[in-house]
Structures are given as C-alpha cells and as structure tokens.
Regions:
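A domain-level signal for the structural core that forms small-molecule/cofactor-binding pockets
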Residues: 1-117
Length: 117
C-alpha cells in the first residue's frame, strides 16, 4: 500500500505523482516486499500514461510470481491537468487492473477496503 509513483506524462512531459496499491495471492512463490516498490519504480521511470503503467505493474508481478492473482490501483495527480489547461489542482486519476481472484467482486471489495483506509 502507498508505493510512491513518480512518472512523467508522455503527452505533456510533466510529472505524475501518486501512490500505487498492490496485492497478490501467492501460489508458493514470493518476492521481497521492496521488489514491488522496485517494479513500480522501474515502469514509472519512462514517460508514461497511467493506464499502461497500472497494467505493466500487474503483468510484471504476474510473471515474477507465477500467478494471475495480482491487483494494482494507482491514484495519482497529473501536473498536466493540475497546472495547465483546466488547472484543477484538487483532482487525481485512479486506474485499476485486477487479475485472477481479484476479478471476483468479494475479493476485489476486500482489497479496495484495505487500501481505502
């Protein structure tokens, strides 16, 4: 929960700053907790769109863990929205990708409950 996301909008070359929330069900494979942070950081380093970043994090973890049971929610401020054009300083964008067991509405609800606190 609350993994720092610091990326760059590929359209406007302005910062995207937020938090990623990641969860998985292990099928026997585990990774060090900091590896989740490193995966988020790895994909955040390049100019991005948030939707793709969210999917890339899930796919990388699915491959590393050998399970489809991975979820990622990213809540981030896009300085291209906050500082230019509409200049809405209070808005953020939320994207989500759910794989495997997280597609079940009860499992998804439980995960979203954990990250909303």
């Amino acid at each position: 929960k609350n993994i720092t996301v610091y990326s760059t909008c590929e359209h406007h070359l302005l910062p995207i700053i937020g938090k990623a929330h990641v969860a998985y069900f292990s099928k026997g494979n585990v990774i060090g907790l900091s590896k989740m942070n490193r995966i988020v950081d790895y994909f955040s380093k390049r100019p991005q769109v948030q939707e793709r970043l969210t999917i890339q994090v899930v796919k990388a973890l699915q491959e590393a863990l050998g399970t489809e049971d991975v979820a990622c929610v990213i809540d981030a401020k896009h300085l291209c929205v906050n500082s230019r054009g509409i200049k809405d300083v209070d808005c953020s964008t939320v994207t989500a990708e759910f794989g495997g067991k997280f597609k079940d509405k009860n499992v998804k609800r439980e995960f979203l409950g954990y990250i909303s606190n």
